[in-house]
A protein has these predicted regions:
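Signature of N-terminal electron-transfer/Fe-S-associated modules in redox systems
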Residues: 1-135
Length: 136
């Protein structure tokens, strides 16, 4: 059996430059949760289907459970924690989810919010049908 291999990953997470050694087989979900305690990134299906682990990487939403941590080298990563204001206040999109009772059980809500953030920040216009097809 071979020994684990590690690689230094340098990236920006929620606006802060970070460096960490990661197992080359580790997912970005594992790195964010285990190394940085970013618990908004949930482990759900671990096959890229449920969206509970969604994060924004260089402006695009990805399932972090199927994105290797080593691929994050040089990237700008945002999790739900990046949306909080300086005094912990919720962002407009987070407040809208609360106001519209769009939280369900809450487990996948952070990932759904990050998908919504990508849609809003992309500047693209989508029909309700297009958004509905992309929703879980």
């Amino acid at each position: 059996m071979s020994e684990k291999q590690y690689k230094l990953v340098k990236c920006t997470i929620n606006g802060e430059y970070r460096e960490t050694m990661v197992d080359v087989r580790a997912s970005l979900t594992d790195m964010l949760r285990n190394d940085y305690r970013l618990t908004s990134v949930k482990k759900g299906c671990e096959v890229g289907e449920c969206g509970a682990c969604n994060v924004i990487i260089d402006g695009e939403c990805f399932n972090s459970c199927i994105y290797l941590a080593v691929w994050a080298d040089g990237k700008n990563i945002r999790t739900l924690e990046s949306l909080l204001g300086p005094n912990g206040e919720l962002s407009d999109i987070q407040q809208a989810f609360i106001d519209e009772t769009a939280v369900q059980c809450g487990f996948c809500t952070p990932g759904v919010i990050m998908s919504a953030v990508e849609i809003l920040e992309s500047g693209k216009e989508y029909t309700r049908e297009e958004i509905g097809r992309a929703s879980c």
